[in-house]
Amino acid sequence: MALRFEILHQSKKSRARVGRIETAHGYIDTPAFVPVATNGALKGVLDHSNIPLMFCNTYHLIVHPGAEAIAAMGGLHQFIGRNAPIITDSGGFQIFSLAYGSVAEEIKSCGKKKGGNTIIKVNDDGVHFKSYRDGRKLFLSPEISVQAQKDLGADIILPLDELLPFHADPTYFHQSSQRTYVWEKRSLDYHLKNPGIQSMYGVIHGGTFPDQRKLGCKFVEDLPFDGSAIGGSLGKNLQDIVEVVGVTAANLSAERPRHLLGIGDLPSIWATVGFGIDSFDSSYPTKAARHGMILTLQGPLKINNQRYSSDLNPIEPGCSCLACSQGITRAYLRHLFKVHEPNAGIWASIHNMHHMQKVMREIREGILNDRI
């Protein structure tokens, strides 16, 4: 079955809504946080059964072990032992981000290429690039990307698009946008030949230009995508993100689920959920955990700080995550980080992921009560 989306409550205070997405592998209560499992695994988190939707990266899975190899083993759900919904990207984000650097690096570098020029050539056919593992030459077209995602068997898939740096040349930005929408149409056409149980979201580009965002919305809305994903460069700070997401969401129909690509830190979630965003993906909680940043209701806690060296309180008093319920103290967790014990990142990641799910439940409750 393709996904079904139902709005259960529309807030009287904002455009925020509580909904439910149903897929062949289960349902997702929205708004939802979607953690990124780059290679099919959440770093530092052993149990993902309580995570409603997980984001896996097609590019990395193509490079190793290969989409066809995963298909031969029954698909991604079987391969990683997950009986719950999965979303995959097209592979384009990783290709272009490896060439230009992360979003933050794009901004700082004003679009100068990073990563040893992994992109060989981009044209209307697709993108020629080098594997980050062994340097072999690879090619990704809209059709190849979608077929790879069909081999993986994710519940929600994305069309191939081109990610540009924040300060891309305006002329090339226009050319890229036009090419991206051609790629998206080709991706959708290929998908619709044999949709199976999968659904495809259209990706809306346009940078920080409101008129381009509106054009992107019209493009996606006019095609039979199952949902909408707000993608591309969203600006250089939270204010830019809020402005871009606000304009974009206002030009999308309410009937389709809306996903915000690559944005899932708590300040951004709180700032944009009121626009009616239904899901947010990010590696934020696990990456923060590996660097000793602990998420709490009182704000982030830098566990490496000397003040926690003899603190025998749980990581967060009152928290029911596995780490806190097993009595992992702040002093002990700090010690593990200081001696570079791998368990440090594991306990911190378990806590941070639990915290994100807790915050999303609170957000849904706030919307249901018209407080958000």
UniProtKB/Swiss-Prot annotation:
Residues 262-268, 286-290 are annotated as: RNA binding. It holds the Pfam family TGT. The lineage of its organism: Bacteria, Pseudomonadati, Chlamydiota, Chlamydiia, Chlamydiales. The gene is tgt. SUPFAM superfamilies: tRNA-guanine transglycosylase (SSF51713). This is Queuine tRNA-ribosyltransferase. It is an enzyme of class 2 (transferase). The active site is at residues 89, 281. Belongs to the queuine tRNA-ribosyltransferase family. Substrate binds at residues 89-93, 161, 232. It catalyses: 7-aminomethyl-7-carbaguanine + guanosine(34) in tRNA = 7-aminomethyl-7-carbaguanosine(34) in tRNA + guanine.
